[in-house]
Amino acid sequence: MELILGSQSSARANLLKEHGIKFEQKALYFDEESLKTTDPREFVYLACKGKLEKAKELLANNCAIVVADSVVSVGNRMQRKAKNKREALEFLKRQNGNEIEVLTCSALISPVLEWLDLSVFRARLKAFDCSEIEKYLESGLWQGSAGCVRLEDFHKPYIKSSSKNLSVGLGLNVEGLLGALKLGVKLSLL
């Protein structure tokens, strides 16, 4: 069965590659600006459901489609993708020395199965080095990442402690997805 990743995220693509999952990457357009909620959990769930509905339009007999959405929450205040450097700096100031939550809603749809999961990755951060913040902002790497969070590089040395489900923090619940894919294969054999 062909697997399609309905996302332009390189982090999600890398997670699938690291787990030996073969896939084709296709962008799905869903207007997240149409969502009016400020609750991080509700937002990420509704965004993922919206992408799942778009994925249903692409669904064919022999394919499965994976979609996901992530937001960052600091003190229950939602951080999406920063629109500019000023907003990116505000996000980083709020995260500095605090606990952050990366909320990721992952979903899979196939002819035999529909799976949806909302998981949270938590990390307690040390204080950021001011000169490193400036370099990070200048690099532009923060663009396109929810809350400007990049656990794979910028944020990595500042993690004091965290939950164990790093793939959720990187934008896709791979462990849950692998279970859903195995279940889908078993169901298709019935």
Swiss-Prot record:
The active site is at D69 (proton acceptor). It comes from the Bacteria. Pfam families: Maf. It catalyses: a ribonucleoside 5'-triphosphate + H2O = a ribonucleoside 5'-phosphate + diphosphate + H(+); a 2'-deoxyribonucleoside 5'-triphosphate + H2O = a 2'-deoxyribonucleoside 5'-phosphate + diphosphate + H(+). One of its GO terms (cellular component) is cytoplasm. InterPro entries: ITPase-like_fam, Maf-like. It is found in: Cytoplasm. It is an enzyme of class 3 (hydrolase). Its cofactor is a divalent metal cation. GO terms for molecular function: nucleoside triphosphate diphosphatase activity. Its EC number is 3.6.1.9. Keywords: Cytoplasm, Hydrolase, Nucleotide metabolism. One of its GO terms (biological process) is nucleotide metabolic process. Nucleoside triphosphate pyrophosphatase. May have a dual role in cell division arrest and in preventing the incorporation of modified nucleotides into cellular nucleic acids. PANTHER family: BIFUNCTIONAL DTTP/UTP PYROPHOSPHATASE/METHYLTRANSFERASE PROTEIN-RELATED, BIFUNCTIONAL DTTP_UTP PYROPHOSPHATASE_METHYLTRANSFERASE PROTEIN-RELATED. Belongs to the Maf family. This is Nucleoside triphosphate pyrophosphatase. It comes from Helicobacter pylori (strain J99 / ATCC 700824) (Campylobacter pylori J99).
